[in-house]
């Protein structure tokens, strides 16, 4: 469909088709938020075109912002003077060129001629800088335009360069083989295999640019550019980002916008030797090590005498080629490409897409990236992301607080602590005589920390953790300082230990050592540690047994860290958090191996504060953002954002208002529906749910999705129905499917559910489609779309409150009660948190249905507590506006029957 330009007020919004009125409102409000430099919380239900509204609204603002800036620069260059002090929009001067421009306050008492002279000089300097920037920008635009029209010539030039490089490499290898001979080459390989694992000399005051994410060497000077004003758009998963890039391509801005997709090394690496390492941490460390080796090799060649011979032998990455990466960067900016296209281009050009994407950031107008790269400060810095005066849009942000909390919370087990200690001891035994004193000092400190962590759990580092029974069991919560004192490690500088781990990459060396040699013990220690060696072997993956073992539904498969020390480094870093912002949870189970130490982040705002402080504007968007009080209080208020800077926007749905959300307060036998912890296990309550579902399945043609508060409760109800015969009555109306706890079985169940509905729709019979019994917080309550016949009715059984007895939740509640003020007439912040967690889960679950304009479904909330005004206020606006509260079941089932009969007749 042809692109159309919509005018909302005085603003023109290009759009691929005629937008809904709610999309126009969304874009206009988004434009105002970005222009005024606010923090916006935007809610737009699924099916309302949120992605296109974000794209067209934000890029329209960026278009106008750049136009105003160009006009202002032209005026300044024409008049040769700086900006006036009383100009209304000082935000036009955002780049570094405007720093220290006209208007810099002068010391009081200076003669007027001095002030005038300095001001004139500043104005001339500003004009000169603007001229340089204008010339640089013009050069960049011309280069990108040439690329767009000369793609074939560029490919030919790349192929020619590759052939020349391959010829040169072959000649170089031939010369080396002639010079060294086969014996020397074999000796070199044997030495390098061993030497790679030995720690290089550590200099604590040395600042290596690679480890901190800065430029690798001087070759990048030519590639460094000014960071123009841009929009950072982030989402949770790479698939969501790929879908967003696809929407950008379809938009009116698709041909002109300079977009770059960022990802992790694991997603963008094209070096198969590095990719084969599997673990994200191993890939990161190996990549940085190769770039460091390249830098040190170059430095060593200049100085003629490298410190260690192994630094010369370490191979540099063949894909880290500045000329090729520059070409790849320009090609990526010339037209919109997703991550798969970037990978293909990187392989073809033999250039690294990961570093290429970093080089493209300064000139890009739209940067697409996953949550972790934006919200984790070290990752952000390593990627070369600069947020100063930029715009950030966080999409799918309903779980933003949980994401930040989870990203900075770390849990280590007793078995991991013991395994890391054993590996490190073996490493020191093998290479101790070759290590410098500073390396030995830090390794002994790490060993001491591991020993004390095991001791604080009540175990002994020298014994097998699987066979160690702890005298005390239970959960204990400590402040960070109390934990350090109790562990007797308060005298160790954890900041220095953390820095050593990062710079020396000891965990990668240790992983390489254990991977190459396995569990190596001296003959002196063999008898004492024989049992422990057996334990270490038991931790290794056993492919044959894993394939033969039946799938365990009670536990989803969790990826194991590549090296226990890599994981423990994260725990050490977490212990450097401010005392008031986190807690340490000691969980002592039956054995040491099952016991854990967990750092719990209480204040996610401490990691979000820098984002809102540096950015011009931040937009937090999602399909269901209610209740928003958590965002306002836990993230924004605690990050120092003033309430006046926060703007809320919630648009309606594109669907007709006749889709009925119902609150049913009592069952068929007039049993009040209140699924509290004390009442939900009563037989009459479980019977009421079964009878209500039987009636709903009798009047709803299509799929019915019923959500329970937990897997345990679902199984309990299912067993009760089976025993009492209700399950058979339900099965006579709809085929029953049950959500598995094992994540890898979810797709299989969904496929069977979908096929059943499709088959029943074609062959009308007594069984009308299917009933899916799901769990709030499970895989099917988030990210799965039950559109059309897959979800004609969504039922929520009770209110899925989190476990109030959880030590983590209790500590979080206490923290909020102490930190946040209590509003008059409102519940304490801790209690409000529990209710908000419940309602967020409800909103996510019921939002699985009604996915587009012509879709329809009935939403049934089975619990009289939903009728309370404070609870209703936390439902999404489009549901809240049309919800009906039914005191008894009769009128409720009649309304559902009428609704579906009318929909069936009109379809």
From Swiss-Prot:
Motif stretch (DEAH): 395-398
Biased composition (Basic and acidic residues): 206-217, 291-306
Major place of residence: nucleus
EC number: 5.6.2.-
Any one Pfam family match given in the protein's UniProt record, by short name: Helicase_C_2
Residues given in the record as ATP binding sites: 44-51
Cofactor: binding comment: Binds 1 [4Fe-4S] cluster.
Region described as Disordered: spans on this chain: 202-222, 291-314
UniProt keyword terms in alphabetical order: ATP-binding, DNA-binding, Helicase, Hydrolase, Iron, Iron-sulfur, Isomerase, Metal-binding, Nucleotide-binding, Nucleus, Phosphoprotein, RNA-binding
Alphabetical GO biological process terms: establishment of sister chromatid cohesion; nucleobase-containing compound metabolic process
CDD domains cross-referenced by the UniProt entry: SF2_C_XPD (cd18788)
Subcellular location: Nucleus, Nucleolus
Residues that bear Phosphoserine: 264
Positions contributing to [4Fe-4S] cluster binding: 269, 287, 317, 352
Record-stated family: Belongs to the DEAD box helicase family. DEAH subfamily. DDX11/CHL1 sub-subfamily.
Alphabetized NCBIfam families for the sequence: rad3
Function: Putative DNA helicase.
Annotated protein name in UniProt: Putative ATP-dependent DNA helicase DDX11-like protein 8
Species annotation: Homo sapiens (Human)
Gene name of the encoded protein: DDX11L8
């Amino acid at each position: 469909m042809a692109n159309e330009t919509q005018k909302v007020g005085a603003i023109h919004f290009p759009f691929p088709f005629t937008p809904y009125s709610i999309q126009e409102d969304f874009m206009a409000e988004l434009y105002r938020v970005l222009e005024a430099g606010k923090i916006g919380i935007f809610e737009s239900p699924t099916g309302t075109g949120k992605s296109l509204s974000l794209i067209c609204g934000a890029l329209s603002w960026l278009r106008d912002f750049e136009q105003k800036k160009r006009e202002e620069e032209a005026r300044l260059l024409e008049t040769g003077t700086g900006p006036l002090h009383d100009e209304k929009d000082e935000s036009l001067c955002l780049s570094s060129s405007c720093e220290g421009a006209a208007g810099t306050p002068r010391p009081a008492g200076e003669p007027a001629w001095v002030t005038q002279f300095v001001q004139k000089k500043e104005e001339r300097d500003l004009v000169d800088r603007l001229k340089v920037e204008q010339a640089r920008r013009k050069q960049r635009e011309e280069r990108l335009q040439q690329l767009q029209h000369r793609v074939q010539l560029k490919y030919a030039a790349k192929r020619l360069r590759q052939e020349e490089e391959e010829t040169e490499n072959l000649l170089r290898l031939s010369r080396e083989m002639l010079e060294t001979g086969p014996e020397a080459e074999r000796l070199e390989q044997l030495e390098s295999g061993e030497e790679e694992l030995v720690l290089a000399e550590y200099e604590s005051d040395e600042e290596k640019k690679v480890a901190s994410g800065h430029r690798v060497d001087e070759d990048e000077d030519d590639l460094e550019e000014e960071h123009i004003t841009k929009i950072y758009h982030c989402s949770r998963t790479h698939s969501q980002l790929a879908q967003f890039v696809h929407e950008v391509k379809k938009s009116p801005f698709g041909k002109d916008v300079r977009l770059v997709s960022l990802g992790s090394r694991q997603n963008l690496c094209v070096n198969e030797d590095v990719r084969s390492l599997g673990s994200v941490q191993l890939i990161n460390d190996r990549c940085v090590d190769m770039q460091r080796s390249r830098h040190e090799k170059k430095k060593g060649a200049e100085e003629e005498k490298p410190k260690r011979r192994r630094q010369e032998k370490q191979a540099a990455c063949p894909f880290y080629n500045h000329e090729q990466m520059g070409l790849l960067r320009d090609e990526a900016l010339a037209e919109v490409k997703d991550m798969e296209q970037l990978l293909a281009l990187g392989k073809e050009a033999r250039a690294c897409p990961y570093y290429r994407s970093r080089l493209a950031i300064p000139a890009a107008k739209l940067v697409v990236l996953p949550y972790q790269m934006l919200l984790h400060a070290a990752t952000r810095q390593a990627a070369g992301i600069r947020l100063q005066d930029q715009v950030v849009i966080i999409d799918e942000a309903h779980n933003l607080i949980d994401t930040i909390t989870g990203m900075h919370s770390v849990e280590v087990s007793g078995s991991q602590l013991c395994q890391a200690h054993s590996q490190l001891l073996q490493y020191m035994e093998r290479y101790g005589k070759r290590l410098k004193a500073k390396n030995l000092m830090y390794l002994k400190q790490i060993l001491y920390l591991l020993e004390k962590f095991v001791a604080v759990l009540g175990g002994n580092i020298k014994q097998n953790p699987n066979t160690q029974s702890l005298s005390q069991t239970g959960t204990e919560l400590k402040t960070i300082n109390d934990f350090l004192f109790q562990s007797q490690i308060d005298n160790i500088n954890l900041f220095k230990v953390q820095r050593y781990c990062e710079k020396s990459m000891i965990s990668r060396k240790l992983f390489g050592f254990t991977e190459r040699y396995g569990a190596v013990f001296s003959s002196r220690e063999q008898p004492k540690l024989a049992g422990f060696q057996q334990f270490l072997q038991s931790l290794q993956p056993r492919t044959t047994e894993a394939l033969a073992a039946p799938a365990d539904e009670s536990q989803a498969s969790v990826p194991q860290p590549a090296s226990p020390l890599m994981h423990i480094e994260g725990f050490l870093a977490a212990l450097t958090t401010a005392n008031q912002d986190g807690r340490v949870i000691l969980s002592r189970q039956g054995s040491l191996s099952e016991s854990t130490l967990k750092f719990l982040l209480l204040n996610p705002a401490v990691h979000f504060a820098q984002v809102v402080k540096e950015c011009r504007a931040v937009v937090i968007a999602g399909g269901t953002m209610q209740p928003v009080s958590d965002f306002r209080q836990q993230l924004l208020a605690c990050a120092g954002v003033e309430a006046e800077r926060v703007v809320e926007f919630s648009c309606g749905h594109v669907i007709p208002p006749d889709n009925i959300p119902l609150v049913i307060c009592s069952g068929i036998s007039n049993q009040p529906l209140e699924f509290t912890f004390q009442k939900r296990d009563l037989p009459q309550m479980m019977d009421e749910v079964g009878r209500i579902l039987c009636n709903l399945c009798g009047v709803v043609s299509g799929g019915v999705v019923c959500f329970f508060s937990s897997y345990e409760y679902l199984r309990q109800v299912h067993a009760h129905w089976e025993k009492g015969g209700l399950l058979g009555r339900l099965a006579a109306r709809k085929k029953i499917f049950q959500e598995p706890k094992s994540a890898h079985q979810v797709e299989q169940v969904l496929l069977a559910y979908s096929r059943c509905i499709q088959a029943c729709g074609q062959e009308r019979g007594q069984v009308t489609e299917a009933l899916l019994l799901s769990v709030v917080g499970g895989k099917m309550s988030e990210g799965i779309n039950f559109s059309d016949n897959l979800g004609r009715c969504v039922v929520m059984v009770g209110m899925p409150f989190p476990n109030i007895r959880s030590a983590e939740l209790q500590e979080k509640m206490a923290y909020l009660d102490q930190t946040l003020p209590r509003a008059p007439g409102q519940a304490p912040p801790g209690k409000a948190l529990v209710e908000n967690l419940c309602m967020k889960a409800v909103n996510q679950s019921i939002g699985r249905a009604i996915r587009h304009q012509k879709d329809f479904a009935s939403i049934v909330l089975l619990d009289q507590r939903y009728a309370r005004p404070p609870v209703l206020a936390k439902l999404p606006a489009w549901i809240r506006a049309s919800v009906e509260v039914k005191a008894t079941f009769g009128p409720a089932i009649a309304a559902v029957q009428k609704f579906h009969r009318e929909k069936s007749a009109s379809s």
